[in-house]
Structures are given as C-alpha cells and as structure tokens.
C-alpha cells in the first residue's frame, strides 16, 4: 500500500498523518463524553488539547531524534519531517502529561482527574495510529512462520503493530468500563493505563527489530518497567487512602 494517500497542490498527504488525525478526533470525542460524567466542560478539554497535542508531537519527535542522533546529526533537515513516521509514543505521552499538569495548575483543576479522562482517549488513538506503521512498513517484528505473519521484503515477520493495536483497543475498552462503572479514586484509570500499557509495550518491544537502544538495552522496555512500577505505586497509594477513609 502506498504511503501517500493523495496530493494537494503538489503536497503529499500521508496515510500516517491521516490515521493520527483520525485517532486524535475520535480520542477527543471519547474525552468529551467522559468529561461530562465528571461535570467538566468540553471547553476545558479543548483548552488542554490545544496545547497538549502540538507539544505531544514535538515530544514524540524529540524523543525519537535523541535516540537516533547519529543519523539526524548528519541529516539535520530531516528532523522536522514527520510525514513518514519517526514519532515515539512515550515521548509524546510524557510531553502531553507535563503540559496537562501545567494547565491544571494554572486553571486549578485536579490533575489526576483530568488524566483519567484522557487516558482512554490516548489508548484509542494509539490503537488507530499503529496502523500507520503497517502502511509505512515499519515497527514490525522478528521472522516467524505463524499463520498471521505479514510479509515485509519477502520475509514473514510478526505484525507487532497489530499486536499493539489490538492490545491498545482492549485497554481502551477496559478503561472506559472501569471509568463508567467501577472508578473509586482519581488516578485509578491513569494507573491502570500505566500498568497495562507498560506490560503490553514491554513484550511487544521485545519482538520488534527497530527498537531505540541505550547501549544493549531497549529504551522502550526500560521506560515500560518504570511506568509499570509508577502505576503500581499509584494504585497502592490511593487504595490505602480509601481503606483508611472507610475505617473512619
């Protein structure tokens, strides 16, 4: 499948960008619906998104470029060209979370409450955006003879984009269910996302052939471990607070 969806005035519009845009739009719709359940206005969601989205893209690109600096130091003109890929999701999430924190402080909003609203939307956006990797023929895995293998350059490989896309979608469904039916404290949905996505990404990353490295270590696996631990700590901390509150 061609990476280029169509051209306008000689400018190629890539499928990668279209899928990311679709993920953002559907994620926004989800966030607005969840926000209404918390009596938070659509304008508040939009105010955060206007800043978080572009900074997330910058963060995702910066993260990727930093760990591929040997290449980009010799090709500086390509640093800002993201039409063909080269966005690292962890960099984007970190930038978006920091942005959300700053805005919440300025607007006197509960930070974890807002993150709980955005996390299901992020998971859905990831599930959709991963298909851009399929079209770009990137982020695939090691050779395999499994029935669902895809063929890249004549070699059957693990469709790791598909593993993560399906995993992200299942995480999205679970987070929405818990948000609507079983949420007990602010930060619950966020910590669930951290644990579930961290586990998913750790194992999927182990199959990929294009991982970013620090020495012999895969960067995303190290980040995944840190995020899982942080998510578990967050869950334990607030569950203890609930137990103490119930005992009073």
From Swiss-Prot:
Membrane disposition: Multi-pass membrane protein
The entry's keywords: Cell membrane, Membrane, Transferase, Transmembrane, Transmembrane helix
Transmembrane spans: 6-26, 48-68, 84-104, 187-207, 214-234
Main location group: membrane
Transmembrane as UniProt keyword: yes
Cellular compartments per GO CC: plasma membrane
Full protein name: Phosphatidylglycerol--prolipoprotein diacylglyceryl transferase
